[in-house]
UniProtKB/Swiss-Prot annotation:
The keyword Disulfide bond applies. There is a cross-link at residues 1-30 (Cyclopeptide (Gly-Asp)). This is Cyclotide cter-H. It comes from the Eukaryota. Disulfide bonds join 4-20, 8-22, 13-27.
Length: 30
């Protein structure tokens, strides 16, 4: 998917509200 410009190393993705999910410590939108 496309990177959402957010990392999820220490905290979860805030961008999950727009369909992003954590993959390999980076938030991606599938």
């Amino acid at each position: 998917g496309l990177p959402c410009g957010e990392s999820c190393v220490f905290i979860p993705c805030i961008t999950t509200v727009v369909g992003c999910s954590c993959k390999n410590k980076v938030c991606y939108n599938d």
